[in-house]
Amino acid sequence: MKKLTVIIVNYNVCHFLLQCIDSLDKALKDIEAEIVVVDNHSRDNSVAALHKHYPHVRVVENLHNVGFSKANNIAIRQTTGEYVLLLNPDTIVAENAISDVIDFLDAHPDSGALGVMMLNADGTLAPESRRGVPSPLISFYKLSGLCDMFPHNRRLGRYYLGYLPWDSPQKIEIVSGAFCMLRRSALDKVGLLDENFFMYGEDIDLSYRLLLGGYVNWYFPTQILHYKGESTHKSSFRYVHVFYNAMLIFFRKHYSHLGMLITLPIKMAIWVKALLALVTMVTTRMRWSLGFAVVRNIAMTGDFVFIGLKTMTDACRDISRKHGLNAIYLDKADPIYINKVLEKTKNKTTLVFDPQSISYREMLSVMRQMKNKKVNIGTYQYLTGSIITHSEIIQ
């Protein structure tokens, strides 16, 4: 039996997937582990790229998009790792992250699931790194905006557990599916992911069932980066439908015993939220089609700071000239010097790192120190000769 099985469900995000596996290979260096990618019928050459560049990765090819839950369950049933890590393809894992997490879980045998400190592309902390169970009352606080108004309040801010410290392990309730380390014996007891959830909500449901099964869910302060949404399209009608439908599925599954007087207002709030999201989406698209809004290539409107070896910066110079990018070139990731450079830039800036000379752990550390500036992360991908940003692949 292997110590760890890593499962990645992929759908049309080839560049992010290759980057994710590059970071994984470094993080798994001294761990007996296997990587399984379940591809939900991608059409962007993801499978061919995996076979070419990462032949050690096991690939399961689905004939159609079966959804996140079912795809993960397929891989879980075919593997035997003591721990199972569900990982989004649009993530970067620091070199120390997985070994630190496994050591912690080994020391806490009552743990069921564990999540980590997720950073957004701009280096800020992703609040969904720690969440509470969305009970009717907690859901009301979230949907009404009270959670956002009082994020550190123990009652009103419980959805994101904003009152907990970030720099130490904490008991939490809901672990994000973007990085969800699971104990296989716990899965054997409470069951796999509920396939009624096509996408979204399955992590909430599984985390809740682990709690009901007597396990403890943890937050651990090791870092990963989550581009958050590059593996989905959050501006689509389908996203709005699937996301809010998942909320209703969870609500019906776990709180149907409550009276209509309690459940109906929450259900109505969910429907109203979904309707408002759709109206906003349709209005925005109408403005674009009528010429009242300018559609810009977000990634190419700001400044770029390329940090790495000469091989990397030379390749990025060619790309910059091709696309007319405003570019600065550095040979080391010194936060103090980078801050001085950023003081001279007026636009949103993308820091593009060289993964051959700068560790992923160092990249994330630098981004944390840039968190109050208008900065996003980028990387240069040697395999495809591409610049990967949070919003665009530039070649």
Where do the protein language model's features map onto the residues?
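Conserved donor NDP-sugar-binding/catalytic core segment of glycosyltransferases
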Residues: 92-128
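A conserved acidic beta->alpha catalytic loop
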Residues: 23, 39-48, 64
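Short, flexible, basic/aromatic active-site loop/helix in glycosyltransferases
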Residues: 133-172
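Short aromatic/hydrophobic "clamp" motif used to bind/position activated sugar donors
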Residues: 84
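A short, conserved alpha-helix in the catalytic core of glycosyltransferases
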Residues: 165-167, 173-223
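Short, well-formed alpha-helical segments that are part of the catalytic scaffolds
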Residues: 8, 13-28, 316
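Active-site-adjacent helix/loop segment of glycosyltransferases
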Residues: 208-284
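Glycine-rich, basic loop-to-helix element that forms the pyrophosphate-binding segment
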Residues: 61-79, 100
